[in-house]
Amino acid sequence: MTLTIDTSTPESRALLRPDPTVEKKPLIGLSREEMAQALASIGVPERQVNMRVRQLWHWLYVRGVSDFSRMFNISKELRAKLDEHFTIARPEIVEEQISQDGTRKWLLRFPPRGAGRPVEVETVYIPEEDRGTLCISSQVGCTLTCSFCHTGTQKMVRNLTAGEILDQLLIARDRLGDFPDADTPDGAIVPAEGRKITNIVMMGMGEPLYNFENVKQALLVASDGDGLSLSKRRITLSTSGVVPEIYRTGEEIGIMLAISLHAVRDELRNELVPINKKYPLKDLLDACRAYPGLSNARRITFEYVMLKGVNDSLDDARELVRLLKGIPAKINLIPFNPWPGSAYECSDWEQIEKFAELVNRAGYASPIRTPRGRDILAACGQLKSASERMKKTERLKLEAMMIAGHGD
C-alpha cells in the first residue's frame, strides 16, 4: 500500500509543518546515549548515529555554536531536520551587571517547564589573575531557608534541568569570548592567559544535591574530555549537608566537595542551616571522612560565614579544629555579605583574623575570602532572582505539579 501526501495547496502544506506551540526538545545537557536516541527518533540512519553524535558534541561543546546552520560539516538537509525538532538556543539574558572589581552577574530567563511562567536564575563570574571561576545555580529558589542567606528567603520554584545548568556555562563562555575564534569584550577583567573560565563552583542558587540527577549529568558533560573538558579537580560542588547524596557525589561524579558548615555545634547549626536537624554534624562529618580520594592535594573545603557574636569566638575556632581532625581540609572564612532585611552583622575584621590564625596554627589553611561583587549583590549568600515575584497561585500550581511528578 502506498501512502500519498497531498502538498498541492497551502493548507495541506501547512499541516506538515511542526506545531509552533510545541516546545522543541533541547539537545544541550543530553548524554551521548540520549543524543543518539534523539537522532534515531528523527530518522538518522543507525549506521550514521554515532558519527552524528560526535559531530554535534564537537559543535556544541568545543566550538560553542548555538545555531544548527553553523554546523558546516553536516548536510543542509539534516541541519534543517535538526532545527525542526530540536533547539540549541541559549537562554535569554535579562540583565548583565559588571562590578567595579570585574565580577559579572547574569540574570538568565528559562522556559516555565511547569512553573506557570518563565523563571530566572543568576550566574556569577569571578575573575582573578590566574583563574576565572563561574558560580552556577542548580535550582530556582531554595528549600533550605538558611537564616543568613539571601537565596534562602526565596521560595523554591523548580529544579533546573541538566541543560539549563550547562547553559549557564555556555552563556558565560559566549560573553567572555572563551570559545575558539571569539573575542574577549573590551575592558573585561579575565585571567592573564589561557581559558577565561578555568573553574566552576556549584555555589549559586539552590541546594545542588536536592537536584542530584540533573547536576550529575551536567557536570559529567562539563568534564567530558571531548567537549568542554573541565578537569574534575576544577569543579567544586557545595552542599549544606545532604548526607546520602554526598556519598553518591563521590562515587558517581568524583568532583571536589565543599561543605557549608557555618557552625560547630548542632544547636546553632540547626538555626543557621536547618537541614542539620535531619543530618547532624556527626553524620555529615562521617560522610566527609568517607569521601573518595581525599589527600592533602585533594581536600574538602569547609565554608564558614563569619557572623558577629554568633559563631566567631575563639572557642568556636578550637571546636572547629577538633571536629575536622583527620579530614584533609581547607577552611574558607567568609565575611558575611549584608543584604536587605538580614538580622546578622559581619564579624569585626580583627576577630576574623584571630579566628583564622588559630585555625591556621592547627595545620588547616584558612584563607579569608575577599568579598567580590558586593555592589551588584553577586557575593556569597546574596543571590536571589526576580522569580520570587511569582504569584502565590502560580507557585501553588507548580508545587501541586511537582508533587504529582510532572515537574522537572
Swiss-Prot record:
Cellular component GO terms, alphabetical: cytoplasm
The cellular location(s) given in this protein's UniProt record come to: Cytoplasm
Pfam families listed in its UniProt record: Radical_SAM, RlmN_N
E.C. no: 2.1.1.192
Which residues does the record give as [4Fe-4S] cluster binding sites? C142, C146, C149
What keywords were assigned to this record? 4Fe-4S, Cytoplasm, Disulfide bond, Iron, Iron-sulfur, Metal-binding, Methyltransferase, rRNA processing, S-adenosyl-L-methionine, Transferase, tRNA processing
What residue stretches are annotated with the Radical SAM core domain? 128-369
Picking any one GO molecular function of the record gives: 4 iron, 4 sulfur cluster binding
What does the UniProt cofactor note say?
Binds 1 [4Fe-4S] cluster. The cluster is coordinated with 3 cysteines and an exchangeable S-adenosyl-L-methionine.
The protein's name: Dual-specificity RNA methyltransferase RlmN
The organism named in the record is: Chelativorans sp. (strain BNC1)
Supply the source organism's classification. Answer: Bacteria, Pseudomonadati, Pseudomonadota, Alphaproteobacteria, Hyphomicrobiales
